[in-house]
Design a protein with these regions (language model features):
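Membrane-embedded alpha-helical bundles of multi-pass transporters/translocases
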Residues: 2-523
Length: 523
């Protein structure tokens, strides 16, 4: 579930190292000796990522609109969401998560201290190791689905996701490679290409739905299988899309499986990755448990949660994820240069900006949950009916207050990763896991039918809030981070913006109801 300034300190513009392409987004190198990030560069990078991510998120919302039209909150849609969680888990763990969090700081440091050629050789070794490990895991996962089918009762709802899972598991390997390639491009300052990569998944997804579903009308099981194959093709497309840009940076995609662990930097990445994998694994276990418990409580619940999440992810991806994408390599370079003061300044400005942006978004979604859901998903002739709208709106109401929490957490976590401290987020995540599981189970047992998934969504928000507070306190103890001076004003401004947005949103909604009558309910 990112113009305002992000960093105000300006540094000197220097030439790229000899023999390397001059790139306005290139990272600092040993030859340049640059130690400070120019403020316009970080802001420009965030703007680029925000724009490209916005395009991808809008397409992601369009794809969910299409999914709602063809599948509604059916058990088949929920089963598809469950199957897609598995490759996404690997993506967040090995691609955008633990491996990237460990790889990008070491890759950035190698660029600074050893030069481009050495850094690219190191990257090839890491990608080769990833392909080898995930290739084996993917194969074993596919083989495991057949015994599971024989063990489950013939009428079990848990049989529905298995055929889709078999098809989509290799997507985990492809998307993890694509995520590492994106991390390299971000380190080179090529944010536009990496930010556009998810665009391909959404585009292929939408085209497949618009073509396959009408052709296979009345055959939803076949429709969903065709879509599963399309997602696998999208994973390959995301890898191929980034290769030309990396080739211009001197990278050659050639796997090498010999002596992978002989490189000290590879071993260092694995050492850094271990605690991060545990921490991110805990987070992903939370995500999986949310959907599994929701599916167990009500076959329609995972689909309702997904529709609500998609709306929340639109502003979260545009701003929160955009900031995190830019901040991780930025903090890594600043930490490698030993510039803690600039890290602090960058973080504080990012948090202030996110608070002012996200608070109004949370307020608007909170007060207009049902109208927003109805406007976006409830089209005549589709399978998304009033019950689907009600279930999804309840989930959105629970998720909306967490929008600010989710985005601020995305700003705090990269600081620890940039400092190559991956253990602290792990400890925090472990506390969150216990809390989230406890609240999830309590929600499923204690809440009435139709509200169980709301408790699950609320548990996610509360857990994220506690995790964010713990990260902030621990970061504060590390040094002069998160100074209180100046934040009181930012909090007041954020709350005023949220209140103004809530009043404006309700006023517009009431005006539309008065002008359009009952038709205003669809707004």
């Amino acid at each position: 579930m990112g113009g305002t300034s992000v960093c105000s300190s300006a540094g000197k513009q220097t030439l790229a190292p000899s023999g390397a392409p001059r790139d306005r987004g290139s990272p600092p190198t040993a030859q340049t000796g640059r130690t400070r990030e120019p403020a316009p560069r970080v802001l420009r990078s965030v703007s680029v990522v925000s724009l490209m991510t916005a395009v991808s998120r809008v397409l992601g919302l369009v794809r969910e609109i299409a999914m709602a039209y063809f599948f509604g909150t059916s058990a088949l849609k929920s089963a598809f969401d469950l199957a897609f969680i598995v490759p996404n888990l690997f993506r967040r763990l090995f691609g955008e998560g633990a491996l990237s969090s460990a790889f990008i700081p070491v890759f950035s440091e190698s660029l600074v201290k050893e030069g481009r050629e050495s850094a690219l050789r190191f990257a090839v070794r890491v990608i080769s190791l990833l392909v080898m490990v995930l290739g084996v895991v993917t194969l074993l996962g596919i083989l495991l689905t057949w015994p599971l089918e024989r063990l489950l009762p013939p009428d079990s709802r848990w049989l529905i996701p298995l055929p889709m899972l078999r098809i989509m598991l290799p997507y985990a390997l492809l998307i993890c490679v694509a995520a590492l390639l994106s991390g390299m491009l971000n380190t080179f300052g090529r944010f536009a290409i990496s930010s556009l990569t998810p665009f391909l998944l959404n585009l292929i997804w939408i085209v497949t739905l618009c073509v396959a579903c009408p052709l296979l009308r009345g055959l939803p099981e076949k429709q969903i299988i065709v879509l599963s194959w399309a997602i696998l093709a999208a994973g390959l497309a995301q890898v191929l899309f980034q290769l030309p840009a990396l080739a211009s940076e001197g990278f050659r995609f050639k796997l090498r499986f010999r002596a992978l662990l002989s490189d000290s930097k590879v071993r260092r990445v694995l050492a850094l990755m271990a605690p991060a994998a545990l921490g991110i694994g805990v987070i992903q276990i939370n995500v999986c448990l949310d959907k599994l418990l929701a599916f167990w409580a009500d076959p329609a619940a995972p689909a309702a949660l997904e529709y609500a999440e998609r709306i929340v992810y639109l502003p979260l991806g545009m701003f929160g994820t955009a900031f995190m994408t830019v901040l991780l390599p930025t903090f890594s370079r600043q930490a490698a240069a030993g510039d803690t003061a600039l890290m602090r300044e960058t973080l504080e400005r990012a948090i202030r900006n996110l608070a002012v942006i996200m608070a109004p978004c949370s307020a608007a979604l909170l007060v207009l949950a049902l109208p927003v859901i109805s406007l976006i998903y409830n089209f005549k002739g589709g399978r998304f009916d009033e019950t689907s709208a009600m279930l999804s709106a309840r989930a959105l109401t629970a998720y909306a207050p967490g929008l600010l929490v989710f985005s601020l957490q995305k700003a705090l976590t990269p600081v620890f990763y940039g400092l190559q401290d991956l253990k602290t987020p792990v400890r925090v995540s472990m506390v969150g896991l216990v809390l989230n599981v406890t609240m999830n189970v309590s929600s499923v047992i204690g809440l009435p039918h139709g509200w169980k998934h709301v408790g699950i969504a609320g548990s996610t928000v509360i857990t994220s809030l506690i995790n964010g507070i713990m990260l902030a306190v621990l970061l504060r103890r590390r040094g002069d981070f998160l100074r209180a001076a100046g934040f009181a004003g930012a909090v007041v401004r954020a709350m005023l913006c949220a209140a103004a947005m809530a009043v404006a949103a309700l006023s517009v909604y009431m005006l539309c109801q008065r002008l359009l009558g009952r038709g205003g309910d669809g707004l």
